[in-house]
Every structure is written in C-alpha cells, then in structure tokens.
Amino acid sequence: FGYDLARRFFALGTVGTFVGYKVDDYLIIASDKVRSGEGQLPASTFKVPNSIIALETGVVEDPDKDVFKWDGVTRSIEPWNKDHTLRSAIAVSAVPVYQEIARRIGAERMQKYLDLFDYGNRDIGGGIDQFWLTGNLRIDPVQQIDFVDRLRRGVLPVSKRSQELTRDI
C-alpha cells in the first residue's frame, strides 16, 4: 500500500504522504512512515482548532450569526472579498477571517489551548496571525489524525458545545 502511494506521488512529480486511520481498529496506515512523523505547517487544517478556540473563548458565539466584516482589501480569491460568518469562512477557507479570529483570541489564550490540545509542537512563534501559515507551528500527519479523532469522539478538553458546533460547520 505505502509503496504504491509513494510511486503515485513520484509519478505526479511531488512529495507527500498519505496517512489513513481505520477508526474501528485504531489502525493507522501511512504511505511514507518517515514523512508521516515529520512536522509540517498546518496551514488550512488549523481552521479546525482555530474554530474550536474561537467558540470556546467566546470570540464567536454563534457560527451562523456572528459576522466578520470584510476589511475592504480585494484579494485574488473572490469568495474572501465579503463579510463572513464562521460557517461561511470555513467553507471558502477564508484566511483573512481566521487571521482576525486569531488576533481576537490573542497569543496567551491561543497558547493555552494549543497546550491543552497537545497540538503539534505548540509553537505559536511567528505572529499571532501567521504562526500556522508561515510561522513556527508544526504538526505531523499522525498528530493531525489524533487531534481530529479526539474531536470526532468529543473528548478534547473543551465544552461539548464547541466541539459539536465545530464538527457541524
């Protein structure tokens, strides 16, 4: 399995790894065992913990009603150029909205929750609105699966409400 996927990545002229998780058996399979243990920038996948933290801290009370006003800066991704709720922002992967959410959460609270979640290397260096995009935060694919599985099971150390709303959006 792993060798076949590695060949496919190579054939596409790219480097990557696929990590799958069989929920019922707690079985993790990886196309590249070395890369599956190497931390990478979480980039867009950080929208999940960022959403949980926003809900838990009250930065967002209602994912369908709290509105983040567009800052008026025209960006190349057209769907970003408008007001968003948390639900609409995650649907179009609106980085500027999530950067604003992170600024409102603040470094102290963000660090607290990354520590509570045991999320990757927990390093928010590089700026409160950049650490998951270009900064110091790293998480490997196996850690990502563990985090998402804890959210799936509702066992993260935050309220059930924040977890349920995040799963819903």
Task: Go through each PLM region and give its residues.
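Beta-lactamase-like hydrolase cores
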Residues: 1-38
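Short linear capping/connector segments at secondary-structure termini
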Residues: 33, 67-73, 125-133
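Mid-domain, small-residue-enriched loop/turn segments at the edges of structured enzyme/sensor domains
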Residues: 78, 82-86, 98-153
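Short, well-structured active-site flanking segments
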Residues: 55-72, 158-163
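Active-site SXXK
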Residues: 39-64, 89, 144
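Glycine-rich, acidic and aromatic/proline-enriched surface loops and short helix-turn segments
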Residues: 11-25, 60, 107, 113-120, ...
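Short helix- or helix-capping micro-motifs
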Residues: 85-93
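Structured C-terminal helix/loop/strand segments within mature extracytoplasmic catalytic/sensor domains
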Residues: 1-7, 39, 103-108, 152-169
